[in-house]
Amino acid sequence: MFDIGWSELVVIAVVALIAIGPKELPGVLRMVGQWMGKARRMAAEFQGQFNEAMREADMAELKKSFDEVRDATSGLTSGNLMTKLTDSLGEPPKLEDLDKPAANRPAADMSAASANDVPASGSIAPEAAIPKTGTEADAKALASEPLAITPEFQHATPEPAPATHETPHEAVKDAKAS
């Protein structure tokens, strides 16, 4: 605490023994020990009060941030949020209504469809709205044509390979030569 070494402590003890005397030295040491104890207790009490005040300040800050989060999330309950979203979307379209042509739809569906689905430029056929690439058009044309089997493919039989009359010895020579 005071950074006193052993040599300094011996010097202080010798000076105290000479100045105070051997009779009164034990009483003085007892009194110095009591003062040191009181000083330590006061320091510990001060440190405890300081730590307690810091904990209270931290707890108050945590409580404040918790209250802010709770206030921010109070209106966002999961059911409340989903209800607001579904109410804003309205009723989903029925599958039967989607399959019907536009002329057979009820007037309410037509107004909703015209507001959401129809482009501003007028009515465009779905096929004309999306241009097809050459490969898509070719694939559709080929898929719609029936397959025709021509006579040249009906009777086609594989021709046998021409037979060679080489001996195995000649085949080995040819293989080595190449």
Swiss-Prot record:
- Its source organism is Nitrobacter hamburgensis (strain DSM 10229 / NCIMB 13809 / X14)
Task: Write down the Gene3D superfamilies for this protein, in alphabetical order.
Answer: 1.20.5.3310
Record lineage: Bacteria, Pseudomonadati, Pseudomonadota, Alphaproteobacteria, Hyphomicrobiales
Summarize subunit and interaction data from the UniProt record for this chain.
Answer: The Tat system comprises two distinct complexes: a TatABC complex, containing multiple copies of TatA, TatB and TatC subunits, and a separate TatA complex, containing only TatA subunits. Substrates initially bind to the TatABC complex, which probably triggers association of the separate TatA complex to form the active translocon.
Residue spans with biased composition (Basic and acidic residues)? 93-102, 166-178
Q: Which HAMAP family did the record assign? A: TatB
Q: State what protein this is by name.
A: Sec-independent protein translocase protein TatB
Is Repeat found in the keyword set? no
Function summary: Part of the twin-arginine translocation (Tat) system that transports large folded proteins containing a characteristic twin-arginine motif in their signal peptide across membranes. Together with TatC, TatB is part of a receptor directly interacting with Tat signal peptides. TatB may form an oligomeric binding site that transiently accommodates folded Tat precursor proteins before their translocation.
